[in-house]
């Protein structure tokens, strides 16, 4: 039963990932992406990593994929023109693909890491430790520096996205709150003697 479930989730994830790449409709591609995430979460459950599976569903399916779906549906993007512009980057994509395939071939071949690399490998967590506790011990004890660096990279990416999307238009009227707070009421207020039946 476990073998059948593994092949079911694995084939579903591979097919969904392939459909994401070749899909012509971006909305359909996002839906296939959600299926790929759910299949990967099922594989994590089979491996006994329920916490990681739940994180995958909540973060990727519940936030990222839904955000992609709303962006694709709400933005008026000419995908035909976009594909035409992306065609010029096809040679670079092929080079990167060949490099990745070569790296995968080296990783799955008879290559063995050096003794120094083996000494840096973390010792396995005790089997008696629960899944969530073991993950916390690995992240916050053995790889705490890498974890903090990953958070710093995400922070820089968030700040960069805000800076890139922030636009200042000169024709838009804005309030200077600090200037309004420090202004002198005697200079900003003016009393007028309005006569009856007349305006200013």
Swiss-Prot record:
Primary location class: membrane
Species: Paracoccus denitrificans
Organism taxonomic ancestry: Bacteria, Pseudomonadati, Pseudomonadota, Alphaproteobacteria, Rhodobacterales
The EC number(s) this enzyme carries: 7.1.1.-
Name of the featured protein: NADH-quinone oxidoreductase chain 10
Localization in the cell: Cell inner membrane
GO molecular function, one term: quinone binding
GO cellular component, one term: plasma membrane
Keyword terms: Cell inner membrane, Cell membrane, Membrane, NAD, Quinone, Translocase, Transmembrane, Transmembrane helix, Ubiquinone
